[in-house]
């Protein structure tokens, strides 16, 4: 059975496996008759290639209509890759299914990512229509990229993001790996059905792990845990 057939016949179980984390693979593997290793490999491949593959914009993206997530969805996440000037948004249902994904360049935003980072991160993200329904926002950038903040003062991306988060008295988590900076701004955007406190409780960032190799592999673990970990208790 190839990956396409497996997804079609067992999409709920496989996506549940992906989003629940690696410990879920044993019972799911037994249920659908696969080994734990096979399920793990499929989960990694599906997440890396289908859910989080934001390395290239889609063809003919210029001028096409951007469809925003519908309020019926219960979880939304956005990933910003500063270096590639690209954004990926993902919609996830309460059952753990990844139902929608839209990729588009940052020129669809009100301002470029660079401008957002250098001018009050939280305020700009809140005001971006693209993030209207997102409960989770990640910013990927080079840790030592410099920005002129005026009066002859230059700060790195990491420093600026930390300062913005502290200044707005909001939650932010920052991780560094291989000269890259991953900042989670998960409570900075509007989502009407989940309160800030409930959302924070639902996101176990202490379980975050980084991987060597491809940059986007870091999301395999974080997204799968964030998406469904205790989510049913939150909604």
Segments and roles (model prediction):
Residues 12, 40, 159-160:
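Residue-level marker for well-ordered alpha-helical positions
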Residues 20-54, 64:
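N-terminal helix-turn-helix
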Residues 63-100, 171-188:
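Gly/Thr-rich phosphate-binding beta-strand-loop-beta motif of the actin/hexokinase/Hsp70
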Residues 58-60:
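A short, glycine- and basic residue-enriched loop/turn
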Residues 98-235:
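C-terminal regulatory/effector modules of DNA-binding transcriptional regulators
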Residues 1-29:
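Extreme N-terminal segment that seeds HTH/winged-HTH DNA-binding domains in transcriptional regulators
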């Amino acid at each position: 059975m190839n990956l396409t057939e497996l997804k079609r016949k067992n999409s709920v179980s496989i996506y549940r496996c992906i989003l629940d984390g690696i410990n879920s693979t044993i019972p799911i593997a037994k249920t659908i008759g696969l080994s734990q290793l096979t399920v793990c490999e499929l989960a990694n491949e599906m997440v890396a290639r289908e859910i989080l593959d934001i390395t290239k914009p889609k063809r003919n993206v210029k001028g096409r209509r951007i469809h925003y997530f519908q309020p019926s969805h219960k979880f939304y996440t956005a990933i910003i890759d500063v270096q590639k000037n690209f954004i990926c948004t993902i919609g996830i249902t309460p059952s753990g299914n990844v139902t929608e994904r839209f990729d588009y360049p940052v020129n669809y935003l009100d301002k470029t990512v660079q401008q957002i980072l250098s001018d009050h991160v939280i305020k700009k993200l809140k005001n971006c229509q693209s993030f209207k329904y997102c409960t989770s926002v990640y910013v990927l950038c080079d840790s030592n990229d410099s920005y002129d903040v005026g009066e002859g003062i230059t700060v790195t991306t990491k420093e600026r993001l930390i300062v913005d988060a502290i200044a707005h008295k909001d939650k932010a988590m920052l991780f560094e790996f291989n000269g890259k900076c991953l900042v989670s701004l998960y409570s900075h955007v509007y989502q009407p059905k989940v309160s800030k406190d409930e959302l924070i409780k639902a996101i176990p960032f202490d379980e975050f792990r980084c991987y060597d190799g491809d940059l986007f592999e870091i999301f395999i673990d974080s997204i799968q845990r964030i998406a469904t970990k205790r989510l049913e208790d939150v909604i």
